[in-house]
Structure formats: C-alpha cells, structure tokens
Amino acid sequence: MKLEFVGPASLLETGDVFYPAVLDGKDLKCSFSYEALQDLDPEGVETNVLQLFKTHQLKLLSIVEQKILNGHAVDGAVHLFSHDLVLD
C-alpha cells in the first residue's frame, strides 16, 4: 500500500477541512470534521480552522493514515471525527 498526502488543505462549506491524498495511485479525499479540530483546541484560542489544522497537521495525518491502514477508506474517502482523536 502506497500512501502520499499531497495537500494543500482547504476549507469546505461545512467548516470541515479537506486534504487530498493518493492511495495506490488513486485519489483519496481526507476530511477532518470541524468538531474534531475544535477538540484539539479546547480553550478556543485559535479561531482559524485552517490554521488549527496546520498546527496539528502531523498528528491528524497520522491518525488518518492509521484509519486507512485499518481499512476505513471507503469509496475513495476517509473521514476523521472527534471520536477518532486520542488526546494526550
């Protein structure tokens, strides 16, 4: 399995963040829920969702990679929600 995160991150109309990837030569849509991103900043210090994503990008992409390896990529997409986060 070959996975490449190609980016860049963009904001969807729903407030979620989209980050494109390529899995075994096919486009893969990675989305990160607005709620999950908010959970990373419980104090509400960062109000820019894209900046919040960029601040936690490595952790978020690592979690999505694990979801993909566990077979959770369906129909060319994988979604990260609050319950997927393992907060320190």
Feature-to-residue mapping (PLM):
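N-terminal start-of-chain detector that recognizes signal peptides
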Residues: 1-5, 33, 50-53
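Short, charged/polar N-terminal "headpieces" of proteins
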Residues: 1-26
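Solvent-exposed, flexible loop/coil residues
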Residues: 5-9, 32, 41-44, 82-84
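Short linear sequence elements within intrinsically disordered, low-complexity coil regions
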Residues: 8-10, 23-24, 37-39, 58, ...
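Generic detection of intrinsically disordered/low-complexity segments and helix-coil linkers/edges
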Residues: 12-13, 26-28, 47, 75
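A short, structured beta-strand/loop element
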Residues: 18-41
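Acidic, low-complexity intrinsically disordered segments
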Residues: 45-88
